[in-house]
Amino acid sequence: MATITIYLKYSGGDLQYSTDNVTYHDMTETSIVGANPGDTVMWTCADDSIDKINNINVGKTKTAGGNWKDIWSSKPAATDNTKRTYSGVVSTDPESPTNPALNGYDINYKIKNGGNVDKDPTIQVPQP
């Protein structure tokens, strides 16, 4: 099982992400490229522009049969008390959605020299 890391930073008045910690994009819509069932997905603060991630709430997505289903066997949770890294595991349930449907999630984080901020991007379901 692999680990996919999404690096987060606050720049230009918006939340930005990178999968290589080099090239950053505004977080609007993205795919967790290469995620397979059982893979761990980690969100981590790339620099001190974000003091901490307060929480990451993930939604459910629809299966081909039209039922709502979690794509996470372990929902994103803080890995330690600093709350600078969150980790979740992609479901291995064979009934989990495997088509590129959309799964909404919300990131609430605290910026340096500022308050709490919410970002509600749309993320594509990890592809098996």
Listing of model-derived features with the role each one plays in the protein:
Residues 31-49:
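Beta-strand cores of secreted/periplasmic/IMS beta-sandwich domains, seen most often
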Residues 18, 46, 59-61, 110-112:
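Predominantly extracellular/luminal cell-surface or secreted proteins
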Residues 16, 71-72, 85:
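Intrinsically disordered, low-complexity segments
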Residues 4-8, 15-17, 41, 56, ...:
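Hydrophobic beta-strand residues in large extracellular and virion-surface proteins
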Residues 12-14, 49, 94:
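Residues that cap or initiate secondary-structure elements
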Residues 7, 75-128:
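Extracellular/periplasmic metallocenter environments
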Residues 2-37:
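N-terminal edge beta-strand
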Residues 50, 54-72:
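Short, surface-exposed alpha-helix to beta-strand junction/turn motifs within ectodomains of secreted
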